A protein has these predicted regions:
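Mature extracellular/passenger domains of Gram-negative fimbrial/pilin and adhesin proteins
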Residues: 3, 20-170
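Gram-negative bacterial Sec-dependent N-terminal signal peptides
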Residues: 1-21
């Protein structure tokens, strides 16, 4: 009888179907650094992580919106010991050769042009060039500054996207 029960359990487990509810990818993004100085994003002087790019005509470039990363607590942590060091802002997300791609809106060929404005060498952030070096001491003064512009493509519609950033001090 015991053997019959074991055989029945094995047979039933082989016949049971499996179901998968959902699957996807998770990206983990972080830094290990000898110095820490947390930054907060500011747009037009206001602390926020939302950059409102406004409205732009098809095939046109929108207004420049300033985006600056400043020390959350300029007098705390290691923020005061950054003189002579480099702060690297690395970006990840839907980067293309032109900039940051649209992820959820209908304007599928539009993108954001994100350009550093007070880096050691100002540059556009793209898939092939996604890290920008700054004089680290700027984090407690003018900040690590960028400008963002919406570049409209030929398709009209809304634009929604997100990009992750990480600041490393060396």
């Amino acid at each position: 009888m015991k053997k019959l029960m074991v055989a029945s359990a094995i047979a039933m487990s082989l016949m049971a179907g499996s179901a998968m509810a959902s699957q996807g990818d998770v990206q983990f993004f972080g830094n290990v650094t000898a110095n820490t100085c947390d930054v907060t994003p500011e747009v037009d002087g206001n602390v926020t992580n939302m950059v409102q790019l406004g409205t732009v005509s098809t095939n046109d470039t929108g207004k420049e919106i300033p985006l600056v990363f400043k020390a959350t607590n300029a007098t705390g942590g290691d923020c005061q010991s950054l003189t002579g060091k480099t702060a690297t802002v690395a970006w990840a997300g839907p980067l293309t050769d032109q900039g940051i791609a649209n992820q959820g809106g209908l304007a599928n060929d539009a993108y954001v042009i994100l350009t550093s404005t007070n880096a050691k060498s100002n540059q556009a952030v793209t898939k092939g060039d996604n890290a920008v070096d700054f004089d680290a001491a700027k984090v407690t003064t003018a900040g690590l500054a960028f400008k963002a512009q919406l570049k409209g493509g030929s398709t009209a519609g809304d634009f929604r996207s997100a990009a992750a950033y990480a600041v490393t001090y060396q």
